[in-house]
Amino acid sequence: MRILYRLLKMADDTVKCYLECCKSSHPKLPLPHNVPVIIGRTPELGITDKLCSRSQLELTSNCYKRYVLVKRLGANTSQINGIDIEKNKSSRLEEGQDLHVVNGKFPHRVYFTGCQNDTKTEKAVVPKLPTKSTDLTKSDLSIKQPERKKLKVSENKSKVLNSKIKPQEKFSSESVYAFDSPSPMSSRCEKKAESNKRAPTHKHWSQGLKASMEDPELVVKEDEQIVVIKDKYPKAKYHWLILPKDSISSTKNLSTDNIELLKHILKVGQELAAEVKDKQPDVEFRFGYHAVASMSQMHMHVISQDFQSSSFKTKKHWNSFTTDYFVDATDIINELETGGKVKDRRTMTSLLNEPLKCHRCKKPQKNIPTLKKHIDSCQK
């Protein structure tokens, strides 16, 4: 039991968790294992926004399982990957996920350090011994000799420790720790590090757009403010997404400061559509946002109204682009200009279950295949 206690204590000392600002606005903040840490509008984070409470979030790390429990204490919303954290409830934050401290602002991430070797069983560094050609005085030899004696003592201690640990090897692989070597914790951590190298980290699907923004096969164009990508699963013949380079999780986190950015996004989308319409004047386009964000990065859709695509398969796909669930980009801009914020449209999710009907003549359709055939021949 003493050995297990020492090893558990050693793991707490070697596996570290840190909170890091994505914009490097402050030094990394340590999150000790199983110790609640309060963050918010504090000098440590450099946050001065009054919408952020001084005690906005409570973070409790689990260094063994490598995740952090995030509890929202403040009145205003906080998000993990664009999904709101309910007040006084805890949500799980893992490595690679984005934590926005308040209202989609101040993005942070957590990361865990690797394990360090057990210094108690670590091999001692043997001092270089003098060669025959080296001239040493008797006083020099008297200084060197005690060091060699100390080394022997440490080796003997190591042998005693090894003899105590070896009987524990009969534990099964299902035990908390398997004592396979004189340094069980370091061996266990090395194996975990090797398995991590072999198996790539799988990010949550809601983070897919951030990876696509760096995929040269998907990127169409970019400038200092935005990136244009081809939709990986297009729902029409022409379907692009325009994303800001700033971390903005959804339209509900927009403010009047973002109006010029939204106008720029719309202008770029209209230019893309114009390039197509120069060659195919009959192609119709819409520019807009979904009422409720499903991804962790805000994006505007530029989509043609033919809806001819093999990726267009479900009623929810259809209703997300042909009902009020699809909000015109100009409406979002107008709401910010007149009211200073974007309307809360969370109740609009019910529109995704509306019966199928043609977006032109409004005639009900039986299923997706019949709807696609109807669109080809439908006239307003």
Curated annotation (Swiss-Prot):
Its EC number is 3.6.1.71, 3.6.1.72. Keywords: DNA damage, DNA repair, DNA-binding, Hydrolase, Metal-binding, Nucleus, Zinc, Zinc-finger. Its main location: nucleus. It is found in: Nucleus, Nucleoplasm; Nucleus, Nucleolus. Residues 176-207 are annotated as: Disordered. A zinc finger (C2H2-type) spans 356-378. The keyword Nucleotide-binding does not apply. GO terms for biological process: single strand break repair. Residues 36-85 form the FHA-like domain. The record marks 212, 290, 301, 316 as: Interaction with DNA substrate. One of its GO terms (molecular function) is zinc ion binding. Residues 188-197 have a biased composition (Basic and acidic residues). Residues 206-312 form the HIT domain. It catalyses: a 5'-end adenosine-5'-diphospho-5'-2'-deoxyribonucleoside-DNA + H2O = a 5'-end 5'-phospho-2'-deoxyribonucleoside-DNA + AMP + 2 H(+); a 5'-end adenosine-5'-diphospho-5'-ribonucleoside-2'-deoxyribonucleotide-DNA + H2O = a 5'-end 5'-phospho-ribonucleoside-2'-deoxyribonucleotide-DNA + AMP + 2 H(+); a 3'-end 2'-deoxyribonucleotide-3'-diphospho-5'-guanosine-DNA + H2O = a 3'-end 2'-deoxyribonucleotide 3'-phosphate-DNA + GMP + 2 H(+). The keyword Transport does not apply. GO terms for cellular component: nucleolus; nucleoplasm; nucleus. Transmembrane segments: none annotated. Residues 231-235, 294-295 are annotated as: Interaction with DNA substrate. SUPFAM superfamilies: HIT-like, SMAD/FHA domain. A motif (Histidine triad motif) lies at residues 297-301. DNA-binding protein involved in single-strand DNA break repair, double-strand DNA break repair and base excision repair. Resolves abortive DNA ligation intermediates formed either at base excision sites, or when DNA ligases attempt to repair non-ligatable breaks induced by reactive oxygen species. Catalyzes the release of adenylate groups covalently linked to 5'-phosphate termini, resulting in the production of 5'-phosphate termini that can be efficiently rejoined. This is Aprataxin.
